[in-house]
């Protein structure tokens, strides 16, 4: 297998320096010296996820071994601490919003284009899981220049809480979300609810799907226990004719069999990786 090299750093929003975005870049060995640049893929986790969760390091490694550069990030509202593996920043999680996710993607993209040593801006792609899938679709549609999108188990809307929950959330000033993996109870404040209600048009995932010019692959498990297959089907139906493909993996769950800590690739994850990397290779050719 080809070797890879990694770089980790933190970006801060200029107008809100308390909002930190942790970034991990992984490319082929010596990628920084490649003449003409290499394709870059922005990778975004989902809700309660992070860039070192489960399959993400393996996904990053596979991208790099394929001759591309993976740019993974923890959103400023992920709640992940300095150790990059613990959801210890409760205040950041409390103030998370979908719009902040989009701003984080913009911040990383801007840094990449202005400071990346070997970025070929004609060969950019995005890859997101779950909530991250919906966010990268919104981001890609707005930017308009991504050559490929990969959405794993994507949400099709941001209004994910029922009316009763939203009313109680507004009344109590927060909603509590259990973390089945860690046993933590995460609190989310009104910023997220305000964002959902005030920025509905900007956060319209299906509307963005209908407008996107980016070739889009959707991979979804038929037994996804977190996001229904109907979400993927509705996104696929909204995409302009011929611009999207839906790959349904029979019996696969939301994380394609992956756990945290990572225990290796099973059949479902291998299938998801194979079809996704093929999509990238077709739309981000290694030679112009």
Q: What residues fall within each predicted segment?
A:
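N-terminal cap/lid segment of alpha/beta-hydrolase-fold proteins
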Residues: 1-36
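Short, surface-exposed "cap/lid" segments of acyl-processing enzymes
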Residues: 29-76
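Short alpha-helix in the alpha/beta-hydrolase fold that links the catalytic acid
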Residues: 56, 214, 228-237
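Alpha/beta-hydrolase active-site loop
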Residues: 92-116
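Alpha/beta-hydrolase fold nucleophile elbow
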Residues: 117-129
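Hydrolase active-site cap/lid region
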Residues: 142-191
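Short beta-strand/loop motif that positions the catalytic acidic residue
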Residues: 211-212, 218-220, 224
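Catalytic active-site module of serine/aspartate enzymes centered on a nucleophile-bearing elbow/loop
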Residues: 252, 256, 260-288
